[in-house]
Design a protein with these regions (language model features):
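Bacterial N-terminal signal peptides that target proteins for export
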Residues: 1-8
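C-terminal motif of bacterial Sec signal peptides marking the signal peptidase cleavage site
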Residues: 15-18
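Bacterial signal peptide processing site
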Residues: 20-22
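A short, structured loop/turn motif at beta-sheet edges
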Residues: 33, 60-67, 117-118
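A short, Trp-centered hydrophobic/proline-enriched beta-strand micro-motif
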Residues: 35-46
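Short, surface-exposed coil-to-beta transition loops
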Residues: 52-57, 135-140
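Mature extracytoplasmic domains of secretory-pathway proteins
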Residues: 63-111
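Short, structured surface segments that line ligand/substrate-binding pockets
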Residues: 98-133
Length: 149
């Protein structure tokens, strides 16, 4: 009996934590969409066990389309800009970042998402797709957000 109660408790905690992630996601997506910001720029950095870890890319977005990008890498670690653009394509607009986060919340074993308190977009994203796997974690950081006129 005690084992069943403990098991039920853990199921309830996991269910509520998943709902909390989904609720925070929807609340912040609604906040972002209510801002109706059609022209903005931001910087994204991805950290993972991948070829372009720790490369920062700044995007200018106009009406959902990337109109400018700037790739920052160190001189001792040059990168192929076309490959970086392709790799970062899923994160090159705030809307795509929300798509990525929504997918991660629904499919990954573990997520931790922090949101900008003013605009609602995700700022720090940690995704562990398979908890027991090694080197599948993804970390995204969005910074330097600026609405443009």
């Amino acid at each position: 009996m005690k084992t069943k109660i403990i098991s039920l408790f853990f199921v309830l905690v996991l269910t509520l934590s998943a709902c909390g992630s989904g609720f925070a996601f929807q609340r912040n997506l609604d906040k972002w969409e209510a801002q109706n910001i059609g022209h903005y720029q931001f910087t994204v950095a991805v950290s993972c066990f991948c070829p372009f870890a720790n490369v920062e890319v700044t995007y200018e977005v106009l009406n959902g389309q990337v109109v400018n990008q700037s790739i920052q890498s160190s001189p001792d670690n040059p990168v192929d800009e076309a490959q970086v653009s392709d790799f970062y394509q899923s994160y090159n607009t705030i809307e795509k970042v929300f798509d990525y986060v929504g997918d991660a919340i629904n499919k990954a074993d573990e997520t931790n998402i922090e949101y900008d308190p003013t605009y609602g977009f995700p700022t720090n994203i940690t995704v562990d797709w398979i908890k027991l796997a090694v080197d599948d974690e993804m970390y995204l950081t969005l910074s330097n957000f600026e609405p443009l006129s």
